[in-house]
Amino acid sequence: QEARSSLKHYDVVVAGAGPSGATAAYYLAKQGKSVALIDRAKFPREKACGGGLCVHIEEFDHIISNWDDFLESKCQRGIVYGPEFLPVDYVSEKPFFYNIRRLQFDNKLVEYAVAEGATLIEGIAVKDFEVSEDKVSVKLRNGDELSGEVIIGAGGSYDLVSKRIREIENMPMNWRDEDIAMALYFEVDVGREFMDEVYGEERISMAHIKYDGLDGYGWSFSKDTVLNVGIGCPRNIIKKLKSEKKGWSERKYLLDYVETLKEQGWFPKDIEIDRKMISGANIPVGMGMSCTVGDRMMVVGDAGGFVSPLSGEGLYYALDSGRLAAESLDVLFSEGDFKKQDLMHYHRAWSSKWGDDLEWLKVGWHLLMVMPNSLIKYAALDEETKEFFTHMFVGSMPAAKIKNKVLALIAKGVLKHEVLSLMTGNKQTVPDLVS
């Protein structure tokens, strides 16, 4: 569906039809709002991602009632390896992680929004927009124009609406390199026989923390018959390595990781991965923008930086920020006021719901990168700690539990040796593990 009518007015213009934008459009359309859902791509389209959904996704009725549309597998076992390849092997009686493929998942979210009445304008990017006293005027790359009461930026890390808010609020115009994770991945069909034999009915999801000593992690997520394999690493680390090591590249790093998976038996030895099969993305992991609204403007999903700083998981935050944006607008449309102070209703909503989670997941990230072997060793000791570690990593652990557990571990002396090392500069020996 292409926009050819000039100056058509909508209640809300959503710039970006990924999970956050499509979800915002879905809920707004259900409310009876007129919605323009715009994206530069034509759907279905692929997106670089591990394709994992934490259990919080069960909050969305239109997701769990349509599992058959896109669900690939339910994960009931997670294995996390430390730098020394000691594993934390956690088995759950019920799924704690759901596997999808973004090609199908994102397309279905768009279809759900359109089915509720949203107008899809695909294959055309937003060129610019202007906020005035009574509307937002939007210009598209093909020359068409439209307007709305509010514009929602859902265009990812380099979103136009996000940049406008940053400019107004005197915030840095771009994410810092240390707040961007570069993710590379590929998907390959390994066949049902290999998948059932190696990854089992539990459809193991696996990660290698600080593979080859680099901050970040490598992963192998098992779908139905497809493996999703990738690596994620802060952009500043990648830039540093490229400048210091001649010939080093993130693609070579991923291919080296595949060889390790083959050696461990997690990847078929007879399948070769070509560099052309690899895709990448920049993921903001900086705990969210300090301000996510302006006059007649708001941002959702990656555009607002709503991604777990620990694992890079952003699908739940994408969907929930889209829903929270729609719920806030439903209140504001009854009053007809869309100034920044009115739209702060949305900013407060996401901040109070999971803003603390993002902050404590960042704490978890730093602990895991600074003292990975100690955390892995202690996490492997008992089932309760395994459960905590796994749920924290996949993003299903509330901030309060993360905070309380980490502080309790330090208070009990589990981590104090390495914490003291950081504080004093004196290397402390990690105590021997005891039952």
Q: Model-found features: residue ranges?
A:
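C-terminal helical "tail/cap" subdomain of flavin- and related membrane-associated enzymes
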Residues: 330-435
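Short beta-strand to alpha-helix junction loop
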Residues: 92-111, 241-249
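N-terminal FAD cofactor-binding segment of flavoenzymes
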Residues: 42-80
